[in-house]
Amino acid sequence: MPKSPGRKSNPAPGAYRPHVAARRPGGRHAIRPAFRVLVHHKYLAVWNELPDRVGLANAQQFWDHVAMTPGQPPKVGTSSIMKGKHNVPKWPGYSKTIHYEITGAARIDYQYNRTATEGTHGDPHGVVKIMSIDLGSH
């Protein structure tokens, strides 16, 4: 199959990775995160818009929570484990879906794995995958 103009090469089989790094709003944290925070690429634009919608401090508090202690109740905001078909782990080794509410202005669903071996090196590390972001009101 010929390559498209401007395309460098065809992707390798299995190279599709839908999650990308969700950078901390406002810049890096002084403390190295315990978990790598990833967001599905279809929510990346919404993730980047989050500080403008909920405030920089609220967006940073969410990121700090999931990057450090995703399985514990947050210090600010509320979280709950979802019920029904949406709570089932989407990937082997991941938690049930956690629903985090930021000041009533946004809801973010995520799952985490303390010892994920995904990635190029295959070394165990903590990963949080943001599955959905809703900036609408209830």
Where are the model-predicted features located?
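Basic, Lys/Arg-enriched alpha-helical interface segments
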Residues: 1-106, 113-138
